[in-house]
Amino acid sequence: SSDIPEGMFEDPKTGKPMLLGTIGIEELQQDPFDEWYQVESDAYQVDTELTNAISDPGQYTYEVFLGTWCGDSRREVPRMEKIFSEMGIDMANVLIVTLDRDKVSPSGEQEGRDIRYVPTLIVSKDNQEIGRIVESPSSETATLESDLFEISLGIPPVPNYSDIE
């Protein structure tokens, strides 16, 4: 007798619905995830000066690993989507994988990707990873946009792993 909608999984820690596996961005924009998704998306102002400075953002492949149960994912992923949209990246071309609390997806998309924290955004060119943003921007003064810009310049920032999860 579970209230978990079809296609979703129960978070063993909270009993709330969570997504697992590869999803489309629209799945985050519907109940029950839309309440946090929409708020964050609406509030975020994209730094268009920086996104416009990224040369040919379409030459890169983007993969987002997140947990719908994770506060950092709930904050950063709606922002990432807004940034991709500003850069003219079709979200259908962004691989979005939702993970459980052990950072695992049922089909194993995370294997070999060294996903320690969520969200993790991996940027690749010609099938080679050129940078990643892990959990949040790389420093107090960095933004998702500045980290993406640095990755595009070939100087990927070192991820800012926090001490606590």
What kind of feature is each model-predicted range?
Residues A53-G88:
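Local sequence-structure signature of Cys/Sec-based thiol-disulfide redox active-site neighborhoods
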Residues D102-R116:
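Short Fe-S-cluster ligation motifs
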Residues S2-P57:
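N-terminal leader/targeting and pre-domain segments
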Residues Y62-T68, M91-P106:
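Thiol-based oxidoreductase modules, predominantly thioredoxin-like and allied folds used
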Residues M18-G21, Y117, I122-I164:
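Non-catalytic, surface beta->alpha helical segment in thiol-disulfide oxidoreductase systems
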Residues R75-F84, V94-V97, E109-Q110, V134-S136:
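"Short basic amphipathic alpha-helical interaction patches in structured regions
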Residues S73, V104-P106, G131-R132:
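Extracytoplasmic/secreted cell-surface and envelope-processing proteins
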